[in-house]
From Swiss-Prot:
S-adenosyl-L-methionine binds at residues 122, 142-147. Specifically methylates guanosine-37 in various tRNAs. It catalyses: guanosine(37) in tRNA + S-adenosyl-L-methionine = N(1)-methylguanosine(37) in tRNA + S-adenosyl-L-homocysteine + H(+). This is tRNA (guanine-N(1)-)-methyltransferase. The gene is trmD. It is found in: Cytoplasm. The keyword Transmembrane does not apply. It comes from Hahella chejuensis (strain KCTC 2396).
Length: 258
């Protein structure tokens, strides 16, 4: 666990498989100096420390097939509970995801209004959707590009928020501008167990019907993009199938999960 001296200005908890990565921001520069001066505090929790098997397994295969692995809910939930037990009351849990609200100066400044941030760093293909639904308050993103994990985003958030805290800098600095690629947001993902907190994995992902699974994932992807980032659709050349699904969504037709 990486710990600075506990103070009330800015508190960060980071759930990560690679806590050592955080040293590149906590040991150097503005953030490192602020930690030494007790202006901010950064703590980390590693889900591997909460795995229950001898191999300290933290990932599993996704239901419905597909490439890659998902982070298991058990170790993540235990790490989150450990973080919450020491976080200031009223802290927010933020999942670092390309589907989230884009980080900008206004969002960084708004973080100063909450007692603390617990930053959840994904790896592999992401984390089980049910944990996001039950435990995450907000999703934040650096932009429309893919990273290998949430650690770089966590470091960017720690740096951008810390520099706005009283006494850390003498003045505010402008946020860097990012350039983006047009893409659709991802669909929900699920891994074992099949039932978690009385929530079942969508039946279509258990069907073994690859065409139905492909269609469901496309529908969910388009729905999320339409709801969360409609600007991406304006810049995207839709296929005939995508255009048809968008029309159905805009007419208010429900997407089947079976």
């Amino acid at each position: 666990m990486l710990i600075g001296i506990r103070i009330s200005e800015v508190w960060f908890g980071v759930i990560t498989l690679f806590p050592e990565m955080l040293k590149s921001v906590t040991d150097f520069g503005v953030v490192g100096k602020a930690i030494k001066q007790s202006s901010i505090e950064v703590c980390t929790w590693n889900p591997r420390d909460y795995a229950t098997d001898n191999y300290r397994t933290v990932d599993d295969r996704p239901y419905g097939g597909g490439p890659g692995m998902l982070m298991k809910v058990g170790p993540l939930e235990a790490a989150l509970n450990a973080a919450k037990s020491v976080a200031p009351a009223g802290s927010k849990v933020v999942y670092l995801s390309p589907q989230g609200r884009r980080l900008d100066q206004a969002l960084a400044r708004s973080a100063l209004s909450v007692p603390g941030l617990i930053l959840l760093c994904g790896r592999y293909e992401g984390i089980d959707e049910r944990l996001i639904e039950d435990e995450v308050d907000e999703e934040w993103s650096l932009g429309d590009f893919v990273l290998s994990g949430g650690e770089i985003a966590a470091m960017a958030i720690i740096d951008s928020v810390s520099r706005l805290a009283p006494g850390v800098l003498g003045h505010n600095e402008s946020a860097e501008q990012d350039s983006f690629e047009n893409s659709l947001l991802d669909c929900p993902h699920y891994t074992r167990p099949e039932i978690y907190r009385d929530k079942r994995v969508p039946e279509v992902l258990l069907s073994g019907n690859h065409e139905k699974i492909r269609r469901w994932r496309l529908e969910q992807s388009l729905l999320r993009t339409l709801q969360r980032r409609p600007d991406l659709l304006e810049q995207r050349e839709l296929s005939e199938e995508e255009a048809q699904i968008i029309q159905e969504l805009r007419r208010g037709q429900l997407i089947s999960e079976t």
